[in-house]
Amino acid sequence: MPPWLAFERRIFVKRDAPEILARALRTGGERYLGLIHGDTILIGSATDPYQPAERRFRVTRRILEVLAEHPGLDIVIITKSPLITRDVDLLTRIARHSHIHVQISLITVDRELARRIEPRSPTPDSRLRALARLREAGIETGVNCMPVLPGITDDPAALDELVRRVAAAGATRIGACALRLDRSARLRYLPFIEQEFPELASRYKASYSHGRNVGEKYREGLTQRFNALRAKYGIGDGDRR
């Protein structure tokens, strides 16, 4: 089974992760807590913590229950799933004595386009509703517009609509960066482009022929565009200060 297919179909549930975390915090005492105080605890950097299996196994929720017992933490959660609203009670509890920030991943608000490029992901509207629900609960929430897909999700009018709706939902910031293609990702992504967006195939091959990043001129232009949109709609960038 190719890696990209295994990523979706072979789900390893770390059932005892909450207990391991609780034991480490309990037995490690101040030494262990000293390692995480002052640093950011990032949940969702490798896989979505609210993927469908979370409904059944509740691993993320139980981890949050453990973290809720320890004040003074800095926690960031990255997800594209509205399932996170299930845990609003815990998030607000944590926010009373720690800093917690949720980042919703969203690269387009076009439902039909989203269906083509993220066919098994929650709809853009459901993510925006989740964002609004978190903000209503007082949770600091932003958006990751990552990756921006050259020629697909970078239309100026589409990006304007994205930032407008993100700001209207109450997001405090939005971060963005262009698509990066490592060799393994290129082997999967370029055939997808040839199938779904054949008119862009030659452009992608040329743009990513010398490395994982699209050209500097494109990246600089994208940064300028998002800076202008942030200013227009009164929303911050992706950096937490």
Q: What function would you assign to each model-found segment?
A:
Residues M1-Q103, I107-R115, P124, L128:
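Conserved Radical SAM active-site core
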Residues I20, V66, R133, G221, ...:
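Amphipathic alpha-helical segments that form well-ordered structural scaffolds
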Residues I77, V109-L113, E118-R120, R133-D155, ...:
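Conserved strand-turn element in the central/C-terminal portion of the radical SAM core barrel
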Residues T92-A95, L131-E136, N227, A231:
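Surface-exposed amphipathic alpha-helices with a cationic face
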Residues G151-R241:
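Auxiliary Fe-S-binding modules of radical SAM enzymes
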